[in-house]
């Protein structure tokens, strides 16, 4: 399967990971995201939209697309995010033990990851069969009396020429919350720590965090944890704050891009 062989070999491991270790991980990640947002998202929105694993192709050239290669690599990256480094490496070892030298498929790859980690990826498999770019909308609310911060996250994928009906995907949505001094607020619920990668699997979900002692500034979709379009009503103050305080280099860059885009639109209008 080309998405596995090229997405894993050429793009994920060699380009993304090797280039990151050799040079700047942040710069390499930013370049990858630029490719996704500038080119692959456009392909998803075009008459040529197709899933990573097409049901049928007319000729071999149909395999050489940004969706198959670049989006395929992002999907592998999401699996790494969901499983963690140790389980991902176990999955890689099992995958090569089973399929080295054979014509393995996307399903073979995901199955190896599931078997090695004991993590259910059945819902996640939709990334391979559903075309289009998901749009994730985030709304938040803070209650100073209860010190609770609420995120309401919804997802939708616009219809594409090849698929009119869309289903919710399993989206790993990485976040961080910052207090007024730029310190990270630990994520907690019911006295227990909460993973900073939220598992968004439904059309709409609500996440409530306890012991948030200050109106937080959220960093959303940290490291571009999923190839989605993010909708959130940022204020200029929030974006400026993230440019100064976000621990994640990508989040600082992304905040700067969003702020710049806001002022460009104001001047054009």
Show where each model-derived region lies.
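Composition- and surface-driven signal marking solvent-exposed, interaction-prone regions
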Residues: 5, 91-95, 163-171, 189-190, ...
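Hydrophobic alpha-helical and helix-loop surface patches within well-folded domains
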Residues: 5-145, 150-151
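Long, ordered, helix-rich scaffold segments
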Residues: 37-38, 42, 65, 210-269
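Active-site proximal loops enriched in glycine and acidic residues that flank catalytic Cys/His/Asp
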Residues: 56, 153-155, 177-179, 232, ...
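Generic amphipathic alpha-helical segments used as scaffolds and interaction surfaces in large
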Residues: 63-66, 79-82, 96-100, 115, ...
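A very general structural signal that marks isolated residues within well-ordered alpha-helical segments
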Residues: 82, 130, 157, 260-262
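Beta-strand-rich binding/interaction modules
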Residues: 120-123, 131-220
